[in-house]
UniProtKB/Swiss-Prot annotation:
GO biological process: translation
Molecular function terms, GO-annotated: rRNA binding; structural constituent of ribosome; tRNA binding
Keyword Ribosomal protein included in the entry's annotation: yes
Family to which the UniProt record says this protein belongs: Belongs to the universal ribosomal protein uS12 family.
NCBIfam families: rpsL_bact
Protein function: With S4 and S5 plays an important role in translational accuracy. Interacts with and stabilizes bases of the 16S rRNA that are involved in tRNA selection in the A site and with the mRNA backbone. Located at the interface of the 30S and 50S subunits, it traverses the body of the 30S subunit contacting proteins on the other side and probably holding the rRNA structure together. The combined cluster of proteins S8, S12 and S17 appears to hold together the shoulder and platform of the 30S subunit.
Protein name: Small ribosomal subunit protein uS12
InterPro entries: NA-bd_OB-fold (IPR012340), Ribosomal_uS12 (IPR006032), Ribosomal_uS12_bac (IPR005679)
Record Gene3D superfamilies: Nucleic acid-binding proteins
Species of provenance: Streptococcus agalactiae serotype V (strain ATCC BAA-611 / 2603 V/R)
Amino acid sequence: MPTINQLVRKPRKSKVEKSDSPALNIGYNSHRKVHTKLSAPQKRGVATRVGTMTPKKPNSALRKFARVRLSNLIEVTAYIPGIGHNLQEHSVVLIRGGRVKDLPGVRYHIVRGALDTAGVADRKQGRSKYGAKRPKG
């Protein structure tokens, strides 16, 4: 327990809160070629690589991911949710925050049904999360 005098000399430091998705908090001024502070719920980007990766132990699968260059020129790894996708290199995608627990380094999700990303076909439940239209009938 510090004395009052010690606290006067060197006050307590408050904890710095770190963002879970830092690339969404950076904008880019292309005219001045500088990064700016600009928080956004989603960001647009171009897929530079689409592939699969294996999760950490004890899980086993081939999880789909895309490497995306955002509109603020930052490159991030984003997860492609749902069964099947139509993404390829140079597809324009929308990303949101949200990590994938068993994929190290994946802190973003691609929004299905937005821009070049198609919704999940034949999905009946939880459709809004996968950009699926309401079935006829």
